[in-house]
């Protein structure tokens, strides 16, 4: 993968310009320069980190995503998670807003891609990916129930609610194991969405339970602190 490309150099120059108005960019600039230098010198891990950073910011996008996909096909969990988050959260480039449209999130295609990457990472043992995969089930069951007249997706069935509960509780249980790669933010979020599943008033929801909903909502709030 090419390191010091025209797009990358332009991004670095934009960051340097931003420093004149906001000194907080200094830390990120230093990190990017060090990462690129290490990658240029052949440090495998840094090449990987640079590809992930570039993809997330829409820099040399096709090449960066191709590099990550190659690693993902080799069974690299971090590459799979990075691609999952890319299609779940999208691209963000503060200096070139046109890059943000490289990935259109909240579409059926992007959600399917994100779920596919998380599922592959989960199958390889990533609890973090499993949490996000379970969260996808919870969000579908909870959100699609809120305003059915505005939804384009098929309405969730009773089994969708049960599936969301099963996958969330399984991910939560696995997060207690030693060496878990979960983040506090990820766990807090899965607690929140599980609470939303229990709170759903959809008549097809067989697990509606206000008490359980409040329990997981409170757990989510405490986990953030």
Task: Explain the meaning of each model-derived region.
Residues 46, 79, 129-131, 183, ...:
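The tetratricopeptide repeat
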Residues 19, 51, 56-58, 89-108, ...:
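Short coil/turn linking the two alpha-helices of tandem helical-hairpin repeats
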Residues 186, 199-225:
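Terminal, low-structured helical/coil segments at or just beyond the last alpha-helical repeat
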Residues 21, 39-43, 74-76, 90-91, ...:
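Short helix-capping/linker turns of helical repeat alpha-solenoids
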Residues 71, 120-121, 171, 220:
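Canonical positions in the second alpha-helix
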């Amino acid at each position: 993968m090419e390191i010091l490309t025209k797009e990358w150099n332009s991004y670095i120059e934009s960051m340097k310009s931003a420093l004149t108005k906001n000194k907080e960019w200094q830390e990120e600039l230093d990190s990017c320069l060090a990462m690129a230098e290490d990658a240029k010198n052949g440090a495998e891990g840094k090449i990987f980190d640079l590809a992930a950073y570039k993809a997330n910011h829409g820099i040399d996008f096709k090449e960066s995503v191709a590099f990550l996909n190659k690693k993902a096909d080799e069974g690299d969990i971090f590459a799979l998670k990075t691609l999952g988050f890319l299609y779940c959260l999208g691209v963000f480039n503060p200096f070139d807003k046109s890059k943000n449209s490289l990935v259109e999130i909240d579409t059926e295609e992007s959600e399917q891609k994100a779920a596919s990457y998380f599922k592959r990472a989960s199958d390889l043992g990533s609890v973090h990916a499993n949490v996000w995969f379970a969260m996808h089930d919870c969000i579908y069951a909870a959100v699609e129930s809120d305003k059915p007249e505005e939804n384009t997706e098929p309405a969730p069935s009773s089994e969708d609610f049960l599936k969301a509960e099963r996958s969330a509780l399984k991910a939560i249980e696995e997060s207690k194991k030693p060496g878990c790669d979960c983040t506090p933010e990820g766990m807090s979020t899965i607690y929140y969405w599980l609470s939303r599943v229990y709170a759903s008033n959809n008549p097809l929801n067989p697990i509606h339970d206000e008490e359980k909903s409040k329990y997981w909502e409170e757990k989510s709030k405490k986990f953030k602190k």
